[in-house]
Amino acid sequence: MKVSAVRGLLAAAVAIAVGVAFVMVPRAPKVNKPERRTAERVFVMGFDGMDPTLTSKFMAEGKLPNLQKLANAGTYRTLGTTQPSESPVAWASFATGVNPGKHNIYDFLVRDLDTYMPDLAMVDKKSHPLKLLWGTIPIAKPVPLSTRGGTSFWVTAGLDGVRSKVLTVPVTFPPEEVEHGELLGGLPLPDLRGTVGTFYYWSTDLSSFEEGSPEFGGYLKRLLFDGGVSKTYLRGPESPILKQEEAALRAKQKSSALSEKEQARLTELKDIKDVNVPITINWTENSGKVDLEVQGTRLSLKQGEWSGWVPLTFNVNFLIKLHGMTQFFVQRADSELQIYAHPANMDPRDPPIAISKPDRFAQDLVKKIGVYRTIGWAESMDKSLQELRTDEASFLYDADKAFDDREKIIFENLKDDNWDLFVAAIETTDRVSHMFFRLIDPKHPMYDKDLASKYGDAIEKVYRRADALVGKIQEKLPKNTTFMVMSDHGFHTFRRGVNLNTWLVQHGYMVFDGQESPKKGLDDLVGRGQFWEGVDWTRTRAYAVGLGQIYFNLKGRESRGIVSPGAEYDALQKEIGDALAKELDPDDKAQIFRAVYKRDDIYKGEYLSNAPDLQVGFNDGYRVGWQDTMGGVQRTFVENNNRKWSGDHCATATEISGGVFFSSRKVANASPHIMDLAPTILELLGVPLQKDYDGKPLR
């Protein structure tokens, strides 16, 4: 076997080790167009979640002078967004210029039509089993699968000879080849565990019951010291080899009883299949500092201090090694020791799978600016703040550092003059808004007057930093550049969680085993430990998964479908939609939903069959409840959101959830839509437009 082939197969194993299948992103057919310089250049700066109401307020107060200047000289509008107003959906429409029915991204989550179980969208993790030689060496690649349809406008531009740079734009992982261009992947680029961000937390004051994975993701580990020394570890990816062995034993278990030896091995695999990095901690109580050793790297950190990026090597076996990196933060080192670590980012110096195109683009960037965060959601402390393991101050410090990383990447690439199209995105505006909306909304259940006095300006500060970046970019742009600033959606307070599955149970659309009527107490139906446990699919007509999506248990689509296509489907759509639209908040009789949309009214295209049958549109203040997003059933239909994640936009009615659009050019269109940007940019660059765009060029 050739060396290049072996390397390719090892890469396949690595991809499975981090939980990502090789994915073929749709591409337009190649044509032989040489590189060319366009008469016009276009620079697009995206700020995830920048809200038009807050932007207008801050501009009126004189706090965003650069955006105000851009608005005065050119155009400022609210930018219409997608159904639903979620980042992956909207950014996919931004890239392709089409509605979700043509690009196939409808939510952060998708459901398995056989098992009904939810999984992350955007990257399809399914693949054929990894074939191994001698149980060690991979000898066959997983099958490439596609998740997103449509063609990114930068791909179309590249095929016409346009030179481009695309930097950390959401829904650009796996990275796609761009002719005459360079692309650095963004969301959903995972950590080395294959998740969007598993944080680590070690503490002496954790109980044994708290150890493990909490509700919002992460890994908590109790520290026990002997003579001032504690031996622990940083949890890594699952070994693809041991994972396959476990899968084989489980498959055998379904058809026949396992031997005593096989059962013992299956039990053992649960504890040993993760590939971990050992950590030694030396600490004296009340010393105010701690010493760590991580694979030869020695750290001495004081309370409140961050480490630099620490390299990590996960040894899957003698052939497969995964290279990552993390940062440690000592939250306490007094009477208790509390240590946080970032998710294990792929090391851009030697990423286990491609995170950029060309592949070396990511590595070459390190030589110019040093190491940088690679995970798609660069602001990694939202989950630990949700779990009350870290505080607001450390979150904001880290968010600022994440912004630094993205900004350095932008300006390093601006040093080159070899581009006609430049597209970059920063998501810090979104992450800060999610976590701090409670401190600008006195009616929020988690509003805290003292915290508001300290951090009530957190959202304003990140908007002002975005404005400063806009000004610095403008100073460096060539004169013939159209400059656009945009966001994918706006923001709202999230005071109340709405449990759609609870409503479906209460009204008889979802039924559990042994449930005689929908009015039977829900106490018996919750807390069973697994999603859909006990659901009677022979009597269930509808179920909710994700952030506002309702699916019917449809014959010929779901594995145990009972709803017939045609008249029965149409009647059920109207029945549930009309009933939900009338629902009022039991606390204050406020209207919960602004609208409930039927599938065929909002989507069209070749992926229509994958769309939800109903999509809800919430009024301000409401969002799907936390457990409901993954198919859980709670005791009450509406409940307070008692979480620090207090601002949101997911499934808020599109009519009130638009983003922002600024342009250095005058635009006559009073109601631009995010789907309009792809054809607008291509027209400015002189690239022929495809026929299937849903958006129209803005003029």
What is each stretch, according to the model?
Residues 36-40, 47, 62, 72, ...:
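Secreted, luminal/periplasmic, and some membrane-associated catalytic domains
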Residues 23, 35-37, 55, 396-417, ...:
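A long, amphipathic alpha-helix that forms part
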Residues 14-25:
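Hydrophobic alpha-helical membrane-insertion segments, chiefly the h-region
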Residues 622-669:
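Low-complexity, glycine/alanine/valine/leucine- and proline-rich hydrophobic stretches
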